[in-house]
Amino acid sequence: MSEVFAAIGRKQLAHLDMWLENRRKNAQRFTSILETHQALTAPSVRPKTKHAWHQYCIKSDSPEQFIEHMGSHAIAARLVYPTPCHQHPVYSEHAQAKATFPITENLSKQLVSIPVHHGLTEEEVIRIIEALRSYS
């Protein structure tokens, strides 16, 4: 890392707690909508932990339809990990490359990420919430 990037990073660290708190608030608002949703499953957080919410991953049995729906509301949504780690070329020489991991392989096709970052405006959060509510 260059000195310039290190200096920028050090300056940004002063904002980290606020950014994480904003992400947590956004995630909680999305989770409260999804707790009773019939077609989507919210991510869970273990008790006594604090999630950083780098990604907000929603499980959908129809991810393409969900991504299209969110896109129709001008919300970026995408498959989070379309290729499971053990299937990446870099692991082709490892023993796991030939193994099957059915849960991992299934989830890689179902987990969709939506914006949760600290810079979302109130209007954007409301638009995401409305899009989540209207999806069936």
Feature-to-residue mapping (PLM):
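PLP-dependent aminotransferase class I/II
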Residues: 1-136
